[in-house]
Amino acid sequence: MMPNIICLKAVISGKVQGVGYRYSTRAKAQSLGLVGWVRNLPDGRVEAMAEGERTQVDKLIEWFKQGPPAAEVSKVDVDEESLGEFRAFEILR
């Protein structure tokens, strides 16, 4: 049986910049075997694209709601995307 591969884009709001959110997201995504990227947005939010097995992506989405210890997440918006061509999980600048 083929694994259920999905790609989701998440936009995380709250106190999520300057608290190590991107670095923690990359570490968490890598530990879950996911590929994609994470970046800061000019308006103070963080945006992430994650692709992999549905169960693992769901775990990352749940983690987004908490984030690293210094983060204060107020909202996580998630949209399903078409599969990308990611080879790793990167921090975009």
Curated annotation (Swiss-Prot):
Record's keyword annotation contains Hydrolase = yes
Q: Which stretches are transmembrane? A: none
Quote one Gene Ontology molecular function term.
Answer: acylphosphatase activity
Q: Which organism is it from?
A: Acaryochloris marina (strain MBIC 11017)
Gene3D superfamilies given in the database record:
3.30.70.100
**Catalytic residues in the record:** R22, N40
Q: Residue limits of the Acylphosphatase-like domain?
A: 7-93
Q: What are the EC numbers?
A: 3.6.1.7
Sorted keywords for this record are: Hydrolase
* Annotated SUPFAM superfamilies: Acylphosphatase/BLUF domain-like (SSF54975)
Tree of life domain:
Bacteria
Per the UniProt record, one Pfam family is Acylphosphatase
Tell me what gene encodes this. acyP
Keyword Hydrolase set for record: yes
The molecule here is called: Acylphosphatase
Which reactions are catalysed by this chain?
an acyl phosphate + H2O = a carboxylate + phosphate + H(+)
| Similarity remark | Belongs to the acylphosphatase family.
